[in-house]
Swiss-Prot record:
Primary localization: membrane
Protein name per its UniProtKB record: Fluoride-specific ion channel FluC
A Gene Ontology term for the protein's cellular component: plasma membrane
Gene Ontology biological process terms, A to Z: cellular detoxification of fluoride
Family: Belongs to the fluoride channel Fluc/FEX (TC 1.A.43) family.
Pfam families: CRCB
Alphabetized UniProt keyword annotations: Cell inner membrane, Cell membrane, Ion channel, Ion transport, Membrane, Metal-binding, Sodium, Transmembrane, Transmembrane helix, Transport
InterPro entries documented for this protein: FluC
Designated gene of the protein: fluC
Regulation of its function: Na(+) is not transported, but it plays an essential structural role and its presence is essential for fluoride channel function.
Topology relative to the membrane: Multi-pass membrane protein
Entry binding sites for Na(+): 76, 79
Length: 126
């Protein structure tokens, strides 16, 4: 682990977490049963991980710290699997099973689709 890698992950994580927090502040109260801020963070993260994987695969000469900054740091700070899990459990514990499953489908299906779209974007434009 290099010192620059450590800094890259930390800076990226802070930026990603701040963006996730901003999404939550702006959109979670709109629909507490399916918080849109968490969904937006996970869907954007799904798309951007596809873009990042495609980009870094085609730009292997870039220093590894750039990938650490973008993928491990920023996208790790942005995406919110633990928050997503607690929100789904809140639906289930409240007896809102259909909303809980909608929540799961929206996050997982949407993120997988957008990851594929991100890869496609880089390959098409690349």
């Amino acid at each position: 682990m290099s010192g620059m890698g450590f800094v890259a992950v930390g800076v990226g994580a802070a930026l990603g977490a701040w963006l996730r927090w901003a999404f939550a502040v702006l959109w979670n109260a709109i629909n507490p049963a399916l918080p849109y801020g968490t969904l937006a963070a996970n869907l954007l993260g799904g798309y951007l991980i596809g873009v990042a994987v495609g980009f870094f695969d085609t730009h292997a000469s870039l220093p590894p710290e750039w990938r650490l900054l973008a993928v491990t740091g920023f996208l790790g700070g942005l995406t919110t699997f633990s928050t997503f899990s607690s929100e789904v459990m809140a639906n289930i514990l409240a007896g809102d099973y259909a909303i809980g499953m909608l929540h799961v489908a929206a996050h997982l299906g949407g993120s997988l689709f957008l990851t594929m779209l991100g890869l496609w974007t880089v390959r098409t434009l690349g």
